[in-house]
């Protein structure tokens, strides 16, 4: 669900988006995908699975480029890592963290993405101090992921550095410093190997620090890990800026500026919620306690129905 932001410091934090380090070009108001990009896959953990930043991103494109069609597939899986690591007693001992290695090939075969956004790291350090072996496992996993996507013929790959970790006591220190190290390594791969990287971690950490300076109670994630709507809006705006979009600071208000727009945003969010569980069910995974989605064929039919509803609204 897309919910307007209310925190007074949010407009200030958005200023950092304009100056944050991007491994990409300048801001241009044009369709951000080439004609060869038809299906975009999002890989990640529970933050990606929640899907709000993806729905926001899609809704912006739907409202601003009604003549273009593109499909966003959310294949995020809660608890997942790319490192293959899992802490002892994870989830109260009910199950270990799922490993992307186990399912990636099935996802790629089923989705056949032209482009992939991948965001890993927050779970890969398994909430422990920086350690050479864990850090090496993350780097190895990211190398494997990138090369797997290249071998699968993915035309464009964009890595997103980890979300900020907001420690209850140390705020942007502690485990967030571990994520900073992971992020710095990932950003370095842009210069070293030409990877596309969006440094969400640096931008969000800076924005959080600005928010805290204005209001010590300001948080993106009440549980330290999972951002609420403000954090998802921040992420959406950052990604849109990376995709050369001129995005206003009040993007949420712009998207919801009319009754028609509100309906479009709601339809996009509903479609995303339905499809993510259908895709996870169709491609399979080893993470228990997940919602059971519709059979993929049925979900795709409903996807088309919702697309038709959106088109009708756009033509009014």
Task: List PLM regions with ranges.
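A short helix->loop->beta-strand "cap" motif at the edges of active sites that frequently abuts
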Residues: 150-156
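Substrate-gating cap/lid alpha-helix
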Residues: 137, 167-201
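Structural recognition of the beta-strand scaffold that forms the well-ordered cores
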Residues: 39-43, 71-76, 114-120, 156-161, ...
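Conserved catalytic region of serine esterases and O-acyltransferases that act on ester linkages
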Residues: 36, 52, 192-193, 215-316
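Acidic/histidine-rich helix-loop elements
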Residues: 74-99, 126-134, 224
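Bacterial N-terminal signal peptides
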Residues: 14-26
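Bacterial N-terminal signal peptides that target proteins for export
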Residues: 3-15
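Serine-esterase "nucleophile elbow" of acetyl-processing enzymes
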Residues: 28-79, 83-86, 94, 104-112, ...
């Amino acid at each position: 669900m897309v919910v307007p932001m209310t925190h007074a410091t949010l407009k200030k934090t958005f200023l950092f988006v304009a100056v944050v380090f991007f491994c990409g070009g300048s801001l241009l108001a044009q369709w951000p995908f080439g004609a060869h990009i038809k299906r975009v896959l999002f890989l990640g953990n529970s933050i990606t699975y929640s899907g709000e930043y993806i729905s926001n991103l899609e809704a912006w494109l739907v409202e601003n480029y009604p003549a273009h069609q593109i499909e966003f597939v959310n294949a995020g899986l809660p608890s997942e890592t790319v490192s293959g690591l899992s802490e002892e007693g994870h989830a109260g001992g009910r199950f270990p963290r799922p490993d992307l290695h186990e399912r990636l090939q099935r996802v790629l075969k089923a989705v056949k993405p032209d482009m992939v956004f991948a965001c890993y790291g927050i779970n890969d350090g398994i909430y422990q101090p920086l350690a050479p072996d864990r850090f090496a496992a993350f780097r190895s996993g990211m190398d494997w992921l990138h090369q797997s996507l290249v071998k699968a013929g993915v035309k464009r790959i964009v890595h997103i550095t980890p979300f900020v970790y907001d420690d209850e006591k140390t705020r942007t220190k502690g485990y967030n410093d571990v994520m900073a190290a992971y992020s710095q390594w990932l950003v370095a791969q842009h210069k070293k190997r030409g990877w596309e990287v969006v440094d969400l971690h640096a931008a969000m950490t800076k924005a959080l620090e600005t928010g805290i300076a204005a209001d010590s109670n300001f948080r993106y994630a009440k549980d330290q890990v999972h951002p609420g709507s403000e954090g998802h809006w921040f992420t959406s705006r950052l990604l849109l800026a990376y995709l050369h979009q001129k995005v206003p600071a009040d993007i949420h208000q712009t998207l919801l500026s009319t009754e028609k727009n509100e309906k479009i945003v709601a339809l996009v969010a509903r479609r995303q919620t339905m499809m993510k569980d259908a895709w996870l069910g169709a491609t399979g995974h080893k993470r228990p306690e997940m919602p059971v989605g519709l059979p993929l064929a049925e979900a795709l039919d409903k996807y088309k129905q919702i697309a038709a509803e959106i088109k009708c609204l756009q033509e009014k």
